[in-house]
Amino acid sequence: MTFKGILDQVGTWGAQQALPVFFGDESTRNRLANDITGDFIFVDIPGGRQDYNDYAAEAFSITVLIQVLGTSHYESDSSSEIDVLDRTFTVITDIAKKAVCLYESEGAAVVKRQNIYDSPKSGWEITLNLSE
């Protein structure tokens, strides 16, 4: 498991869904979101964790944030907003299933995101703690 390997894997999952994948922190994602139309994937690796027990270091785990988003219709068109949320939910759950098959995961937090970024986007976000 490497930093680039994880990014490449998310890129592969995005390609399987015919969605572009972009990497960056919160401020980069906000800036990029202004120019993106249609559905897409954001990925970030904001950190990791190393635990120790009485005998040795445990496996290093890394936190991976994946957002699957589309153009938000929040508070303007409920039907279109639900369509975006449904579409992106299907993609995020597919990615989650593939991630836990490929890596060991301590768990995942899935959060609905609506009307985020300056150019509003809605969809789903998953935070995975992955290790080998």
Give the predicted meaning of each segment.
Residues M1-E26, N30-R31, I45-E132:
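Charged, amphipathic alpha-helical segments and their flanking helix caps
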Residues D35-G47:
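A short, hydrophobic beta-strand-centered structural micro-motif
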